[in-house]
């Protein structure tokens, strides 16, 4: 999946890429733990799906924080994905939802080889805000988080045994770093 040289990446392609890159690692760890712990196949599968969904939410949260996070809390410079033209959920949806004028400006910034870092980050962030990418990303993060909770709820153990995983997922979604 070579996205870095394309401006026409579909959201579904990106979600599949981050599922394979990030989500399955967490999902597999949860499923292996479930199997080793003697869980039923159904519970192991539900824990896998829980991990997959929370992994998607986590990666989208990472994309979001790279644009809207607080540098002091995030631990790295904001806008790194913007300056490197990384195809994130944010940029992909900006291209897919922009009007002609906004798209042309995005293309100019993505194709620019010389630029002032702060100016590029500010301009692309402004475009994201105009297009509504900030709200779109937050809605998608919440969607995957809600889906993860559905799968965790299906695991057939007492709620108190799932509480730690639920709390961990909640902390992941409220993180600012």
For the regions a language model picked out, list residue spans one by one.
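All-alpha prenyltransferase/terpene-synthase fold signal
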Residues: 1-177
């Amino acid at each position: 999946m070579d996205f870095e040289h394309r401006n026409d990446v579909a959201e579904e392609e990106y979600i599949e890429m981050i599922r394979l890159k990030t989500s399955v690692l967490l999902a597999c760890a949860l499923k292996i733990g479930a199997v080793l712990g003697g869980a039923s196949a159904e519970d192991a599968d539900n824990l896998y799906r829980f991990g997959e969904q929370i992994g998607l939410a986590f990666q989208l949260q990472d994309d979001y924080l790279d644009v809207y996070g607080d540098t002091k809390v995030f631990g790295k410079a904001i806008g790194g994905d913007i300056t490197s033209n990384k195809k994130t959920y944010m940029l992909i949806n900006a291209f897919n939802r922009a009007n002609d004028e906004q798209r042309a400006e995005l293309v100019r910034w993505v194709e620019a080889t010389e630029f002032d870092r702060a100016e590029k980050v500010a301009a692309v962030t402004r475009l994201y805000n105009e297009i509504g990418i900030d709200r779109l990303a937050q809605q998608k993060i919440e969607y995957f988080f809600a889906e993860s909770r559905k799968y965790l709820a299906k695991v057939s153990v007492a709620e108190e045994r799932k509480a730690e995983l639920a709390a961990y997922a909640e902390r992941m979604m409220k993180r600012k770093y």
